[in-house]
A protein has these predicted regions:
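Extended substrate/RNA-proximal surfaces in nucleic-acid metabolism proteins
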Residues: 1-119
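Charged catalytic cores and adjacent phosphate/nucleic-acid-binding surfaces used
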Residues: 1-7, 89, 96-102, 107, ...
Length: 188
């Protein structure tokens, strides 16, 4: 889930803190597993904000026999020996927390879920869906377009930094204006 125009409540702050602690715990476990699996010491500082892309880059820059894609595919992807699952906030809790503190709540990258169609059903309770996202494989946008029409959603754009550059997938100015007009303090 994505929350836009946030004015964090204490409950949201507490949940974000828990997520960040889990993110660091998970990264530390994956780094430990990779180092044990490969016999290579990774040059990586594990702290807030770390994710698998950072770990994959560190693997690619090490003497381990994996490039960035190989680190995901062979080590830290969902089936990899060094993968550690996240403790994910359930959708109901996440939606409630974001509704209390955000002007706009959006479903993030719907094609990254095991069942994209089921994920898009959550949009019935949301304001928007991430229509533009830099997926690593071609996707048919029709299911997202259908959800946008069916639930009268705003399209949002991806901002994840999974590549070496930002701004790969985003909104055009007209779509951005529609999103911005729904945010707190918008004077349009």
């Amino acid at each position: 889930l994505l929350g836009y125009g946030a004015d964090p409540t204490p409950d949201l702050t507490a949940e974000l803190d828990r997520i960040q602690r889990d993110r660091v715990r998970r990264a530390r476990q994956m780094v430990d597993l990779i180092e044990a699996e490969t016999g290579v010491s990774l040059d990586l500082s594990v702290g807030p904000g770390i994710g698998r892309p950072h770990i994959a880059r560190a693997v690619a820059e090490s003497s381990a026999p994996y490039d960035y894609a190989g680190a995901f595919g062979r080590l830290i992807g969902g089936e990899g020996p060094c993968y550690v699952p996240r403790e994910i906030t359930d959708a109901e809790t996440g939606i409630a927390l974001l509704r209390e503190s955000c002007g706009l709540v959006s479903l993030a990258h719907p094609f990254r879920y095991r069942d994209p169609e089921a994920a898009l059903e959550i949009c019935a309770e949301l304001d928007a869906v991430e229509r533009y996202y830099a997926y690593d494989h071609p996707m048919d946008p029709a299911p997202v377009e259908h959800a946008i029409e069916r639930y009268d959603l705003l399209p949002t754009g991806g901002s994840d930094a999974h590549d070496q550059r930002l701004g790969v997938a985003g909104l055009d100015s007209a779509d951005w204006e529609r999103v911005a007009s729904r945010l707190p303090g918008a004077e349009r």
